Regions:
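A conserved mid-protein helix/loop that constitutes part of the nucleotide-sugar donor-binding site
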Residues: 34, 200-210
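Conserved donor-binding/catalytic core segment of Leloir-type glycosyltransferases
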Residues: 22, 181-202
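N-terminal pre-catalytic "stem/leader" segment of glycosyltransferase-like enzymes
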Residues: 1-133, 140-144, 158-160, 214-222, ...
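Catalytic binding pocket for nucleotide-activated donors in carbohydrate/polymer assembly enzymes
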Residues: 20-28, 33-47, 51-56, 222-351
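Extracellular/periplasmic catalytic domains that process cell-envelope and extracellular macromolecules
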Residues: 14-15, 124-126, 186-189, 237-239, ...
Length: 351
């Protein structure tokens, strides 16, 4: 369906691999499972590739693991088959030796942020030690020469020379481009906000929620760890919400003490772009954020204010600015679906 978006080099490189195997986190067992589900959807529906979703407790004997593109996560790859003819994209590649000791190609998937310090990551892209190649306006590639960007606890406090690669990328909405429906802008709204997401520490969230409640708007939360929703249920609840804001967590005092203000849980500081705001826009809602970094990334396509009372008031005005919402939908449709992300992985393969 979307193979026409690939260059001849990208088509040739992609065709060398017979299948895509996503490994780990069966659906609803972890919030990362929704990302895994989208890799399956993008490569199977979007590019017509044979796909399999396997995990440590589901290892069939009739799947050929040779010449495959594996996509996994460093905490879910204990029993993953490591095959010389395949390539491995690993988010949180906390044990690169697992792959490199078997002489396979390893490409780590990292958050597309300039700086992050946590139990997995320890890097700052503008410190003079990183040499990046732009894959798209939304993704970068780097040839790594050591494990220095891993947190010291993951490398035994020792920096070792290693030959692997990484891609810095965002996540995306769960709609593929052909699934966007501009009539969704007109879905009838309820006098409620259905806020679906993991509980987190946020200064702005309660202020905005209180502004809604003071104005007679019901605030309803749903925790995916306790009550997983299907993609369609999530979409419908977000579409029915009178507003669809997103609030980034700030991390805990302990996180700051251990890793500094640019710790991985402090999304307001590191500039993490969440899928929630991209989903909201793709579903026909006004994009709303409390993150200046998200504003810088999405520009005119998202509403931002540092004062939550102001953000609430402007959101209530702009929520019926249908030309603005449509323009934002078009932007996300062309830039932030898993078709875009899949193409970025393929471009990394071409490096």
């Amino acid at each position: 369906m979307y193979n026409n978006l690939l260059t001849e080099l990208e088509k040739s490189t992609f065709s060398k691999y017979k299948r895509v195997i996503v490994w780990g986190f069966p659906i609803d067992t972890h919030t990362h499972s929704y990302i895994h589900a989208m890799w399956i959807k993008a490569f199977s529906v979007g590019f017509g590739k044979e796909t399999h979703w396997l995990h440590d407790n589901k290892i069939p004997h009739d799947v050929d693991y040779n010449d495959s593109i594996f996509i996994t996560e460093g905490y879910a790859d204990n029993k993953i088959p490591v095959v010389a003819s395949s390539v491995y994209f690993v988010h949180n590649a906390i044990s690169p030796e697992k792959y490199l000791d078997k002489n396979v190609r390893l490409i780590e998937i990292r958050f597309n942020v300039n700086e992050i310090h946590d139990i997995n990551n320890d890097f700052k892209l503008d410190d003079g030690t990183h040499y990046l190649t732009e894959l798209s306006p939304h993704a970068k590639y780097e040839k790594l020469v050591s494990n220095k960007d891993l947190h010291a606890s993951k490398r035994g406090g020792e920096i070792k020379l290693m030959d692997y690669e990484c891609i810095y990328m965002y996540w995306a909405t769960d709609l593929l481009p052909h699934e966007f429906n501009y009539d969704d802008i007109n879905v009838q709204k309820e006098n409620a906000i259905y806020y679906i997401g993991s509980p987190c520490r946020s200064i702005n969230y309660p202020i905005f929620a209180n502004a809604c409640i003071k104005n007679g708007i019901q605030w309803v939360t749903s925790n995916p760890w306790n009550t997983p929703l299907s993609f369609e249920q999530n979409k419908q609840l977000m579409q029915r919400s009178i507003l669809c804001p997103d609030f980034r967590p700030i991390g805990t005092q302990q996180d700051t003490a251990l890793f500094g203000v640019k710790n991985g849980k402090n999304h307001l500081e590191i500039g993490y772009l969440p899928c929630r705001v991209l989903k909201a826009i793709s579903y026909g809602q006004l994009g709303i954020t409390d993150s200046i970094h998200v504003k810088k990334i999405l520009g005119e396509h998202v509403l931002y204010a540092d004062n939550m009372e102001t953000l609430f008031a402007s959101s209530m005005t702009e929520r019926v600015n249908y030309p603005r919402i449509r323009k934002a939908m078009e932007y996300v449709q062309h830039n932030h679906t898993y078709v875009n992300r899949a193409i970025e992985l393929i471009r990394a393969l071409c490096q």
